[in-house]
Amino acid sequence: MFETKNNEWQVEVDGTRSSDGKEVQKLFTQLVDKSITRIHVLDIDCLKDKQTIEFFDEIIKRGLPDEWKFQDVVALTFRRGRDEVEENIENEDEEKSKTTPLTGIRQAILEGGNLRDNEFVHKFEENGCIFSAMTLEYQNASTPETIHIRAEFKGSPKIFEVSIVNIFENEGLEAKKEQSSLSVKKNLEVRTAFWNNARIIYNEIVSKQ
């Protein structure tokens, strides 16, 4: 836990169980004075199905400051939408006679490149889906550093988390990517900036409901 600015503290949880985030929320709720304290948690259940897609699309545009240039979506996790599942249950008999290439697929985890424009992803969107995790590649504007940031809703309840899963340094004329590292301080600064920008986006979307 550390102070990010006057009277604002950021808490990072290195959880080992899916319910750890929930337990930490519960602990702070019991400890703090609710009349003067606000706890910021980004919960996927507060977003409608299409809003989860809007959330991640905005993160692509605004996740990090100009120091880092977005390059690509290199991993994406999505699953059948809650609204679509409920509709299928209500119309189960009809659906049995109307099969589609996506019938039976509940969740998909894709890795590769240019995934946001992937045809399979777009088909899933058309049928109703939820984006729950995305790994984004960024190139530093002034250094040869490239990072992969994992942004995901996970745990129980599914709350938003940010981690840097890969760090590369571009070497040679061909800009070959070699495994590298960031200092603990810089790693934290990048993750904090990303999470706080995500919070702004999340609050903007929720406020439109």
Each model region followed by its residue ranges:
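Intrinsically disordered, low-complexity, charge-rich terminal extensions
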Residues: M1-Q209
